[in-house]
């Protein structure tokens, strides 16, 4: 059973104002109802190769052991990943790095202690996909689209901090990276760069993991323009 506040109008709350007692405070910050992002065809982009880029850790166990050791020294690990989108036949596709036959990841990695998130992601994007001819890549990063936390030194990650966790072991941020109309990417030889359509990712945690399979929902707030 709901109770209607005595000051509430029968036609709904006043729009654009906030009520505190009998006073109204005008909201000055505009609400962004629609964020427009330009997408370009996959065929606009050129993909070359460069020397292999290997993981810091030789196994999952080694990764969590290093995370444990670093946590004791510098605290929670901060990770950033970039979401790059193209389109084919007006269907959005996310660029993923494929290692082997079944492992997919977003480009990104660990931040250095004290490193700015956006500048760190630009550094990592250049290390992973940056071209080799000396031309600097212009990474446009304006939108954080997701936050994930690792509560323990174990694989599970969640888009929230569980109530009983006071010291998460890793915080991962996902950023939308807006691509220029044309670009050249250099892909490490031990990876493939694949374009996965959103309908393939949607609700497909068994194939891509919980983070990548959540991208269709995270990206649904954007209005894509297919150029």
From Swiss-Prot:
PROSITE patterns to which the protein is assigned, alphabetical: NUDIX
UniProt modified residues of type N6-acetyllysine: 23, 29, 56
Tissue expression from the record: Expressed in the heart, brain, placenta, lung, liver, skeletal muscle, kidney and pancreas.
Phenotype upon changing residue 158 to A: Abolishes interaction with CPSF6
N-acetylserine: modified positions: 2
Assembly and interaction partners: Homodimer (via N- and C-terminus); binds RNA as homodimer. Component of the cleavage factor Im (CFIm) complex which is a heterotetramer composed of two subunits of NUDT21/CPSF5 and two subunits of CPSF6 or CPSF7 or a heterodimer of CPSF6 and CPSF7. The cleavage factor Im (CFIm) complex associates with the CPSF and CSTF complexes to promote the assembly of the core mRNA 3'-processing machinery. Interacts with CPSF6 (via the RRM domain); this interaction is direct and enhances binding to RNA. Interacts with CPSF7. Interacts with FIP1L1; this interaction occurs in a RNA sequence-specific manner.
Protein name: Cleavage and polyadenylation specificity factor subunit 5
Organism in which the protein naturally occurs: Homo sapiens (Human)
